[in-house]
Each structure stands twice: as structure tokens, then as C-alpha cells.
Amino acid sequence: AANIDRQAFDPNDGFALISSEEELRLSWEIAGREAFIDFQFIPRQGNTPAAPLIKSLGIDSSTIMEGLDPNYLFWVGDRDLELRDGWEIFFDRVPTRPYSVEKGYLVPGEVTVSTREGRATVEIDGLNSENFSGSLAFIFYRDSPFIHMEARVSTERPATAFLYHVGLAKPETQGQNLEWIDAFDNPRIEPISNSTASVYQTRYRSIALSNTNGSLVVSPFPHQYLYPLDFADNFGYNWAGHEYLDMIDGFAFGVRQPP
């Protein structure tokens, strides 16, 4: 069972919280309706895998999505920090040197729920990969449907360059569709199939999973997402499908920083 710390939670900030040893529900108002998200902290037991972190989310009494599990992949390479005439390389060619890909695993430990001036944060300690460690945080905003999910991790590995791929895995896909707007501004919708994951060249770097109750869109924060670029080519910033990079089990969809 996870230890849930709610000392910094104030219901006067516009959020309601219900928690137990294994679950947590956060709810808030959006345009006169009540949005909710249910987290569950059920670890792996023997051959039984851990339960998806996000049990369900929706509005009022209608569940839009259920059984979602965040996944983070880190591409880890090496910076060239050798000084040349007193300067470090600015345009470092990291991809020309060996790099590896590692998966982050979340084993929920301390869960901290806090509020401040119209926003709430659920931070779950225990996100670790081979070289990174830290927590997974969800930030919610009063009267807004946006949920900001971020890995708050750091590394002691010296001279590290990294990229990340992040997504949501969903084991049960019956009745679900994949939606996006393609590079030519055409809306696209396809039922979820058993095809291997592939990269999508979308507009707005956004891709959605939808059903008859609603949709869930994955999109990066534009000014926190990419390293500085001198051009604006569409390298395919979204991905979806089964067994992504042979590192995420089943179906998942998300965003990526292209190597």
C-alpha cells in the first residue's frame, strides 16, 4: 500500500480528494461539471502484473477512459565536454556516438497531494531507470481539462545527453479509436488494430484515443518539449500501436523526441 501525504492539500483551492491505502480520487470543476481521475497503487504480486496506475478518468458519472499506465523511455548518450581553446562544443554531435535506450519503472512509494492557488499536484515517488531516478507528477488546473504529466527525475551519470519518449499504455482497446490531424490538415480516425507501433507525422504534435464517451489527447508542452532547432521539419513526434520499440507491452500511444 502507498503512503499518501495530504498535509499540503487544501479543499479551498477548488479540488476534492478521497483516498484509501490503494486508491486516490481527485475531482475538480470544469465549466459547471465535475471531472475526476482515479489512481490505484497495486504492485506486482508474483505472476500478476501491477495494475495500471490510472484506474479511470471522466466527467460527472461518465467514465471516458480506464486502465491507463504511463511509460517513459530514456535515450541516453554522452556529451563531449572537452574544452577546445577554452570552449565547449555548442553543436555537439551526440547521435554519432554510442547511445542506449532504457525504460523507467514506477514502483509507487510516497504519494504527495498538494494544492496551491487553483492547481493540484499528485506526485508519486519511485520512478527509476538504469540511470535516472525520481518521481512521476500530475498537475491539475481548476476549471481546466488539461492534465500535465511529468517525470521529475535526475541522474548522477556524468556528461549525459538524453531524449525521452513518453506514452500511455492501454491493455484493453475494444471500442477505441485513434484520432489525429495529419500533416496536410486532414482529420484521421482509425479503429485500434493489432499492428506494431509506428511513428505518426501529425499536426500540433497531438494524437488521441477516443470512444463513444469522449477522448483523451496526448500532446507535449510546446516550449518545454524540444531542444533549440533552426528549422521546423515534421519528424513524426507522435507514435501509437503495439509493442513500441519492443519495450512497452501491448497497445500504447504518446509523444517522442526524435533522435
How should these model regions be labeled?
Residues 1-2:
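Boundary at the C-terminal end of the N-terminal hydrophobic targeting segment
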Residues 40-45, 141, 194-197, 222-225:
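A short, sequence-level motif marking secondary-structure junctions
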